[in-house]
């Protein structure tokens, strides 16, 4: 949870340093809009060094202008199992 009160769904830490490596937000919408990303953007203000991912039902992967990766859930899982993220 960010100091502002916003939160993200999943936080992945580096094993030994406890630095945040990934912040992941999960949305059930068909297309992620800016309003869906308030929490992850607030979290980024406190942890600017990590990767930001939003998983949703979007039709294809994309990246926002400010660097948040948006992945359709099925494509995210394929990439996850292939080792792309961790």
Question: What are the residue ranges of the model-derived segments?
Answer:
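A cross-kingdom feature that marks ATP-driven nucleic-acid transaction machinery
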Residues: 1-86
């Amino acid at each position: 949870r960010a100091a502002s009160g916003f939160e993200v769904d999943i936080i992945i830490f580096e094993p030994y340093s406890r630095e945040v490596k990934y912040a992941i937000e999960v949305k059930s919408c068909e297309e992620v809009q800016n309003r869906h990303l308030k929490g992850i953007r607030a979290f980024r203000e406190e942890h600017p060094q990590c990767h930001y991912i939003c998983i949703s039902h979007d039709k294809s992967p994309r990246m926002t202008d400010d660097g948040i990766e948006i992945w359709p859930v099925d494509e995210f899982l394929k990439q996850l199992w292939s080792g792309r993220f961790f």
